[in-house]
Amino acid sequence: MTSLQMPKVDKSVLSNKDKIASDLNKILKSENILSHEDEIRPYETDALAAYKQKPLLVVLPETVEQVSEILQYCNENKIKVVPRGAGTGLSGGALPLADCVLLSMGKFNKILEIDYQNKCIVTQPCVTNLAITHAVQDKKFYYA
């Protein structure tokens, strides 16, 4: 078995942490930007706990427009972004990087549409399996 190879850390991004946080504060309220060790620790891994790495910053957008502005800023400044839903994934898809902005979609937790006839549900990224089950159980449906 080979070891996990993560992308190389961009030291210039690490050294600009305060500026990046300040710039992102033009998009988000300060309480929606996490940078202190104890604040970001819960985000150092998803349910796949074999690999742990604290991100540079965690951002908690509340609107689609904020997500768009964060992505535009990070793209223009060549800052890696790792999106994260509920953090329950087991495949490592939301593993943070030391030089990334972790884009927590935790505030996007609404069920948008339930189509019982076609057995289809449209949700925001942070809706849990249990929330879906609770939403459909009165119609005798169950979701994972």
Sequence positions of predicted segments:
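N-terminal accessory segments
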Residues: 1-47, 76-79
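N-terminal glycine-rich flavin-associated loop
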Residues: 12, 24, 49-81, 99, ...
